[in-house]
From Swiss-Prot:
<dbReference type="InterPro" id="IPR048576">
    <property type="entry name" value="Rv2175c_wHTH"/>
</dbReference>
<comment type="function">
    <text>Binds DNA at low salt concentrations.</text>
</comment>
<dbReference type="InterPro" id="IPR041098">
    <property type="entry name" value="Rv2175c_C"/>
</dbReference>
<protein>
    <recommendedName>
        <fullName>DNA-binding protein Rv2175c</fullName>
    </recommendedName>
</protein>
<keyword id="KW-0238">DNA-binding</keyword>
<dbReference type="Pfam" id="PF21531">
    <property type="entry name" value="Rv2175c_wHTH"/>
</dbReference>
<feature type="modified residue" description="Phosphothreonine">
    <location>
        <position position="9"/>
    </location>
</feature>
<dbReference type="Pfam" id="PF18367">
    <property type="entry name" value="Rv2175c_C"/>
</dbReference>
<keyword id="KW-0597">Phosphoprotein</keyword>
<dbReference type="GO" id="GO:0003677">
    <property type="term" value="F:DNA binding"/>
</dbReference>
<feature type="region of interest" description="Disordered">
    <location>
        <begin position="1"/>
        <end position="27"/>
    </location>
</feature>
<comment type="subunit">
    <text>Monomer in solution. May form homodimers. Interacts with phosphorylated PknL.</text>
</comment>
Amino acid sequence: MPGRAPGSTLARVGSIPAGDDVLDPDEPTYDLPRVAELLGVPVSKVAQQLREGHLVAVRRAGGVVIPQVFFTNSGQVVKSLPGLLTILHDGGYRDTEIMRWLFTPDPSLTITRDGSRDAVSNARPVDALHAHQAREVVRRAQAMAY
């Protein structure tokens, strides 16, 4: 980027992989500087995680954003997400397809949230990553990918 110092933490949006915005318009997201702040790393490291497939993002309103649901309440990436993304990328899925699958309610997926006995049916796979069904989502991804 002209005028930027080598090693600058500001990455060009066009050079960062991101899928089409297939998310609900009300789905909360973080921009890359906020993700960097949460993770305690430079924005360039977040861009690297996106390029390496450890995170996925969408293009929204001229920028690149990452869904808030990919992070825990303490600001860390949900434990099973990077491995799940690797499985799906290795299976040939692109970021847009991955986002669509993660955020589409699945009538066969029922989750129970930590601290609750109430089952939520027709859950989204991304929500199951925060529940006891994370392994089930990974298993389903493996079956889809191979």
